[in-house]
Amino acid sequence: MASIQLARTTRGGDGVARADGTRQADEAGSGTLYLVPTPIGNPGDITLRAIEVLRRVGVVASEDTRHTYRLFQSLEIDARLVSYHDHNEESRSRQLLGLLREGTDVALVSDAGTPLVNDPGYRLVAAAVEADVPVRPLPGATASVTALIGSGMPNHQFHYVGFLPRKEAARRAALTALRSTPATLIFFEAPHRIVAMLADLAAVLGDRPAALARNLTKDDEEFLRGRLNELTARLRVEQVVRGQFTVVVAGSPEAHADEDRALAARLTETLVRHGAEARLIREVVREVTGLPRNWVYEQVRLATERSGPLGNS
């Protein structure tokens, strides 16, 4: 692959601009690698800082240069674009690292959203870190978190999965490994596979609560909420399913129950050790965990037997 040629003037950010698009190297002698999010639907998703960085850097590495060129035209960004995708990631990373070492600032973008999130870029970032090249990730649009916060699903703990395997057997095997995960699960899926994917989710994980986010941040953005079987049935009636989907699924109820039982056991032991009355312990544990009355009573009984009798039981 030919080397990357620089052929335009840019404004320097942290250093002095050169006519070839590079800047005077900083004290470390290298440029900076910027990871720049782009819109996931609405063009207004992009940040002012992202626009400033993209206008300034010497090179922008893009998953699809045609797509990025159209975006840059709308934002009046004149940038040197080079391709960076799954098929040239290794060789292009070496070239870009060479430019960074020479003092050129480089920005990495994906077609939509935040770079490296289900997109290429890991090799370049890892190489930059290894070479002590500064890496600056910019905050911005990402479909996974946007869908999560609008889903109504628990968001204190979540597991980003991305795309599942295309073939049913491999897809179900991957889901089986996730079956006991307590965290909310986040997936991406294409419109022509979404119905089959939802059916497999229900078959392997059970009929859990879920939310489908379609065409996030676009004018026709839509959230569909319900249980997996219900959502599968709703999409089956669409003659042609359209849109890009982010799927948010509740975590394992069994795993949450295990966590609640473990918490109840620790809480019971602590209260017994501090001499609390059995009646108060039962009330506190049930209020905190929501576990069944009979189970809580039995735990309190066992704990008090181990530590000696308590009054007012």
From Swiss-Prot:
GO terms in the biological process aspect are: methylation; rRNA processing
Q: Return the similarity comment.
A: Belongs to the methyltransferase superfamily. RsmI family.
> Which residues constitute the signal peptide according to the record?
none
According to UniProt, the name of this protein is Ribosomal RNA small subunit methyltransferase I
Which HAMAP family has this protein been placed in?
Answer: 16SrRNA_methyltr_I (MF_01877)
The protein's job, in short, is: Catalyzes the 2'-O-methylation of the ribose of cytidine 1402 (C1402) in 16S rRNA.
The organism's taxonomy opens as: Bacteria, Bacillati, Actinomycetota, Actinomycetes, Micromonosporales
Task: Show the segment(s) annotated as Disordered.
Answer: 1-23
Alphabetized UniProt keyword annotations: Cytoplasm, Methyltransferase, rRNA processing, S-adenosyl-L-methionine, Transferase
According to the UniProt record, what class of enzyme is this? transferase
* Localization annotation: Cytoplasm
Q: Can you name the source organism? A: Micromonospora olivasterospora
What PROSITE patterns does the entry give?
RSMI (PS01296)
Q: Which GO terms describe its molecular function?
A: methyltransferase activity
Q: What is its main location?
A: cytoplasm
According to its UniProt record, the EC number is 2.1.1.198
A family per Pfam: TP_methylase
